[in-house]
């Protein structure tokens, strides 16, 4: 299974982190105040849009200062007990706690829901109050009223969206290391759609590169759409598979800006990666199949049926796993994969282009539409091509791809052995063996 590039090329040190110089300086001063025994703040909150490097900065900081990183996802209430446990141990001296140098990282604190995760915020506040170790929290949007007490207890550090030039340097460096041909205009288009999200840029670059083998403007325009500021396909998958409640799974699908059919392909690719039980996989695919049926009906009958699509594609897949009902269940962390259909597009795009140009050439010669050429003219031309291939090729100036397509139609127009036998019976009926007397 190929490693996701955003993990493969994640900065290993603060020096490698692009476009966040002020933030890096603030973090260095803060951690050094801890190391000198006079911390300026017990905890910092790194906040900013997805993909700007919040978690990466925390990891790079720990690596640069040779500190162990203890990481938890604050938005997962299954970690509430862990947070409380860490809060207690963090108040004990380093020699009892284990390795002396540590940073505690709590990711996605804005994912805490006050009613569903009751007790999480008090537990984090207790951790900050008692800790003998530096604490880093991250959030996309820390301004929810329920997080006010946390904001008052930490040093707030904002990360800005990444600019065009740092992102372009990053993408070009990856293309060079992966030995991939990339066109500047194509990279510009990816960046324009990304809303400054480096992870989104890298994910899109990898999908196109693995599918097409090169990154051109046409390929990018075909596959890359403007990123929603809140959700991308990877986050949608994670939010569905990790959902604890029906509404969480449905909201994840409803809020996603990914095309419905494309999102189904994402689930199709990743269901067997997330679920290990064959029964769970079967139930998830059953829900996905029914969602596909309802989507087809919604297009034909009315979009009121779209709610059923969301129910099946969100909660239907999320709760297909019976393992979730077991006490202490925790979803597996999975490196989600791009849909194989992207690779299929790469393989078929050249053929589709050849069909288009062939129909256009014939249409120009016969002054008819491409649809009429496909339905009426092409079958006759294919039959003629079997006897006069060179004349047709010269007249239409066919490319190798167009010749291949015409050969496919030629084979399709040939009668099968059954059809030949039926035709023989029709025109040469079997003589009766009986004789007149």
Swiss-Prot record:
Its keywords, alphabetically, are: ATP-binding, DNA replication, Nucleotide-binding
Q: Which residues bind ATP?
A: 48-55
State the source organism's domain of life.
Archaea
Q: Which gene encodes it?
A: rfcL
Q: What is this protein called?
A: Replication factor C large subunit
Q: Region Disordered: which residues?
A: 410-437
UniProt lists compositionally biased (Basic residues) regions at: 426-437
Q: Which InterPro entries match?
A: AAA+_ATPase (IPR003593), ATPase_AAA_core (IPR003959), P-loop_NTPase (IPR027417), Rep_factor-C_lsu (IPR023935), RFC_lid (IPR047854)
Give the GO biological process terms. Answer: DNA replication
The record's CDD domains line, in alphabetical order, gives: AAA (cd00009), HLD_clamp_RFC (cd18140)
Asked whether the UniProt record includes Transferase among its keywords, one would answer no
Family recorded in the similarity comment: Belongs to the activator 1 small subunits family. RfcL subfamily.
Which NCBIfam families does the entry mention?
PRK04195.1-1 (NF003226), PRK04195.1-5 (NF003229)
Relate the assembly described in the record.
Heteromultimer composed of small subunits (RfcS) and large subunits (RfcL).
Q: Tell me the function of this protein.
A: Part of the RFC clamp loader complex which loads the PCNA sliding clamp onto DNA.
A Pfam family it matches: AAA
Provide the transmembrane region boundaries.
none
Where are stretches of biased composition, namely Basic and acidic residues?
Answer: 416-425
GO molecular function (one):
ATP hydrolysis activity
């Amino acid at each position: 299974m190929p490693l996701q590039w955003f993990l493969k090329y994640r900065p290993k040190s603060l020096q490698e982190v692009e476009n966040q110089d002020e933030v890096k300086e603030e973090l260095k001063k803060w951690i050094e105040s801890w190391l000198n025994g006079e911390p300026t703040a017990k905890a910092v909150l790194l906040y900013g849009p997805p993909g700007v490097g919040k978690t990466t900065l925390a990891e790079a900081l720990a690596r640069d200062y040779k500190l162990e990183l203890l990481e938890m996802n604050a938005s997962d209430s299954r970690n509430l007990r862990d947070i409380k446990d860490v809060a207690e141990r963090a108040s004990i001296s380093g020699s009892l706690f284990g390795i002396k140098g540590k940073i505690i990282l709590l990711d996605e604190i804005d994912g805490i829901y006050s009613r569903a995760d009751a007790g999480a915020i008090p537990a984090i506040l207790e951790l900050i109050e008692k800790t003998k170790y530096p604490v880093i929290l991250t959030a996309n949007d820390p301004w929810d009223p329920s997080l006010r007490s946390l904001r008052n207890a930490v040093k707030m550090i904002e990360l800005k969206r990444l600019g065009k030039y740092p992102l372009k340097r990053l993408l070009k460096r990856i293309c060079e290391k992966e030995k991939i041909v990339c066109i500047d205009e194509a990279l510009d288009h990816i960046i324009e759609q990304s809303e400054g999200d480096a992870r989104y840029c890298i994910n899109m670059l990898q999908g196109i590169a693995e599918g097409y083998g090169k990154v051109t403007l046409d390929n990018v325009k075909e596959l890359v759409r403007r990123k929603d500021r809140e959700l991308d396909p990877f986050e949608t998958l994670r939010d569905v598979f990790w959902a604890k409640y029906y509404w969480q799974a449905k909201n994840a699908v409803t809020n996603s800006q990914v095309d419905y059919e494309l999102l189904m392909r994402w689930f199709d690719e990743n269901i067997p990666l997330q679920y290990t039980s064959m029964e769970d996989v079967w139930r998830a695919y059953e829900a996905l199949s029914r969602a596909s049926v309802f989507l087809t009906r919604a297009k034909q009958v009315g979009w009121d049926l779209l709610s059923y699509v969301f129910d099946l594609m969100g909660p239907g897949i999320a709760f297909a796993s019976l393992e979730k009902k077991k006490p202490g269940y925790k979803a597996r962390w999975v490196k989600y994969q791009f849909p194989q259909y992207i690779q299929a597009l790469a393989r078929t795009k050249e053929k589709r282009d050849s069909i288009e140009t062939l129909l256009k050439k014939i249409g120009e010669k016969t002054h008819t539409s491409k649809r009429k050429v496909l339905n009426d003219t092409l079958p006759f031309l294919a039959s003629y091509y079997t006897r006069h291939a060179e004349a047709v090729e010269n007249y239409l100036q066919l490319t190798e791809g167009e010749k291949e397509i015409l050969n496919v139609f030629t084979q399709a127009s040939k009668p099968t052995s059954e059809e030949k036998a039926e035709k023989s019976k029709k025109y040469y009926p079997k003589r009766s063996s009986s004789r007149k007397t």
